[in-house]
């Protein structure tokens, strides 16, 4: 009994931090459950730790999103909440209707697909459909690509789909940029994340644009969103869209397989049906995996470029402040300079000093008489570093006596880069 009591007391008195290692004598006196717990912690597999870390990240992201949603919901008025609920219900109904329509459209096209395959009018009408769904917030781009493969086959359908996509996305980009020009300017001046993403497209813009186009993002919404970045030019965006057109073979191929299954269902053997169905599933799986992988790589590349841009701006800020002269422009391109200036303000806040010496303030302290004509607060430009010695233009504070009734004290703090 005394031995058990002593070992239990020692175990309870041990510190919670596992940083310090115990001697063999102390380990022998520890109770059995402490050895079991420590062995379980030490034998945890790396895969278990990775799964725990991934699960924690998912939980944290979900928690942040829930908090943000609740915060936004509290700010809404009564009628805004009614409108939000109505919009959500409408979106759900439209999504269900679109899924039902997509499933039925191939049954409707089955009897006329062979006749429309040789019709240039049908080709042109479907081309216009793909072209116009490039404008936000229209949907149906992937469905029209599958229909193109269903009616015209994989290669002819791909040509229709690719040409309409390239021209439609470029025109949508230009129109969206024209309409959203005020929004773009406001975002560039206020949102540091938007400015950082705009600057990342300055380095390998074409490569990053191709990666964005390969991501599984809503097509028309992506056209409008990318148009808000002033560092992206319409021709570059059109070229990036043209370079990823081999991706468009996926929906065209799926459409052609669906037509074969619908027309020759009774004639095909079970093995042929299985091959066609497996090819469709495999193609969809490859598309999903590729999109997910490129999406992760795109985010990683964007973060890398943002960190590089911030490091360059930080070095420029520190060099200018060490030399005591204001910052010049970051780029000859006005759009790039605007984005860099927005990012520079954020970096100045992180470093601890401002670009224009906002702390250089002349403070006037009036006497107790309180003259109405005496100013209370003025600002002056910084004229030079602090110095102890006097010049001919400087007055001796001890020789001036008490001075006038209103005295001016200059408050100036300047943070030097370490």
Swiss-Prot record:
Region feature VTT domain, mapped onto this chain: 149-258
Stretches that traverse the bilayer: 82-102, 120-140, 158-180, 235-255, 274-294
Keywords linked to the UniProt accession: Golgi apparatus, Membrane, Transmembrane, Transmembrane helix
Record field: compositional bias (Acidic residues): 391-403
Coiled coil feature spans: none
UniProt similarity note: Belongs to the TVP38/TMEM64 family.
Name of the protein this chain belongs to: Golgi apparatus membrane protein tvp38
Organism: Neosartorya fischeri (strain ATCC 1020 / DSM 3700 / CBS 544.65 / FGSC A1164 / JCM 1740 / NRRL 181 / WB 181)
């Amino acid at each position: 009994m005394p031995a058990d009591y002593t070992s239990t007391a020692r175990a309870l008195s041990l510190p919670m931090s596992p940083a310090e290692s115990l001697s063999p004598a102390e380990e022998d006196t520890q109770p059995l459950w402490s050895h079991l717990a420590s062995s379980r912690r030490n034998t945890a597999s790396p895969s278990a730790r990775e799964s725990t870390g991934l699960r924690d990240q998912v939980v944290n992201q979900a928690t942040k999103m829930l908090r943000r949603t609740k915060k936004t919901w509290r700010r809404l008025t009564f009628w805004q909440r009614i409108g939000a609920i109505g919009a959500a219900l409408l979106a759900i109904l439209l999504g269900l209707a679109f899924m039902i329509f997509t499933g039925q459209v191939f049954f409707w096209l089955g009897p006329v697909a062979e006749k429309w395959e040789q019709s240039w009018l049908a080709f042109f009408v479907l081309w216009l459909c793909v072209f116009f769904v490039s404008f936000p917030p229209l949907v149906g781009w992937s469905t029209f690509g599958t229909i193109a493969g269903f009616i015209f086959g994989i290669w002819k359908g791909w040509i229709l789909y690719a040409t309409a996509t390239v021209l439609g996305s470029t025109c949508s980009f230009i129109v969206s940029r024209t309409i959203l020009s005020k929004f773009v300017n406001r975002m560039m001046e206020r949102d540091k994340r938007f400015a950082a993403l705009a600057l990342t497209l300055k380095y390998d813009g074409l490569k990053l644009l191709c990666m964005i186009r390969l991501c599984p993002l809503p097509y028309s919404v992506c056209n409008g969103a990318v148009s808000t970045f002033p560092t992206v030019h319409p021709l570059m965006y059109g070229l990036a869209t043209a370079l990823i057109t081999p991706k468009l073979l996926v929906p065209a191929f799926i459409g052609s397989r669906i037509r074969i299954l619908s027309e020759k269902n009774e004639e095909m053997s079970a093995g042929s049906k299985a091959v066609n169905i497996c090819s469709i599933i495999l193609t969809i799986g490859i598309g999903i995996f590729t999109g997910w992988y490129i999406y992760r790589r795109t985010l990683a590349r964007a973060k890398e470029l943002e960190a590089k841009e911030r490091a360059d701006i930080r070095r420029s800020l520190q060099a200018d402040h060490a030399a005591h002269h204001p910052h010049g422009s970051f780029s000859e391109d006005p759009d790039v300079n605007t984005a860099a200036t927005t990012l520079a303000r954020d970096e100045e806040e992180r470093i601890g000093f401002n670009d224009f010496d906002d702390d250089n303030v002349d403070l006037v302290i009036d006497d107790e008489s309180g003259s109405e004509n005496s100013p209370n607060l003025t600002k002056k430009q910084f004229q030079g570093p602090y110095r102890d010695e006097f010049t001919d233009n400087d007055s001796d504070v001890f020789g001036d006596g008490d001075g006038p009734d209103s005295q001016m004290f200059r408050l100036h703090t300047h943070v030097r880069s370490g």
